[in-house]
């Protein structure tokens, strides 16, 4: 038997991610997308996964769009060590897009940290690729 859990891309058009679990204990994640939109939607990027990333054997990436690939750095940071299956063009594009997204997030975090310090809220932590 196979169980499919929709983790994103439902109720919103971003954050595409589906967990497929077999009765033999195999776990495959299809896409690992970033939630985009308003503040309330984007806060979902920092919520608990609902599964242990260390237990995922394979990430199957359908394409490079950030709403399908943007949380890969967080997945790795949180313990994913499995293989990633995707097409060569998607792998190439993801390398470029995720590095660019990391740079933008660093700039956003620096701005937010300066703002937080002025308001006594402290620094933000980044997920490094």
Language model features: what each stretch is:
Residues 14-16:
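Residue-level marker for the onset of beta-strands and adjacent loop->beta junctions
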Residues 12, 22-61, 65-82, 86, ...:
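Pre-active-site segment of Zn-dependent metallo-hydrolases
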Residues 8-10:
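Short Gly/Pro-enriched turn/cap motifs at secondary-structure boundaries
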Residues 1-3:
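Extreme N-terminal starter segment of soluble prokaryotic enzymes
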């Amino acid at each position: 038997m196979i169980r499919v859990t929709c983790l994103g891309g439902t109720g919103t058009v971003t954050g595409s991610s589906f967990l497929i679990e077999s009765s033999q204990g195999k776990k495959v994640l299809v896409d690992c997308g970033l939630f985009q939109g308003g503040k309330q939607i984007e806060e979902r990027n920092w919520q608990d996964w609902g599964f242990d990333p260390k237990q995922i054997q394979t990430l199957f990436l359908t394409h490079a769009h950030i709403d399908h690939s943007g949380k890969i750095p967080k997945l790795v940071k949180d313990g994913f060590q499995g293989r990633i299956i995707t097409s060569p063009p998607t792998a190439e594009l993801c390398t470029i897009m995720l590095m660019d997204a990391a740079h933008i997030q660093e700039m956003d975090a620096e701005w937010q940290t300066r703002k937080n310090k002025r308001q006594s809220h402290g620094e933000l932590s980044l997920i490094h690729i």
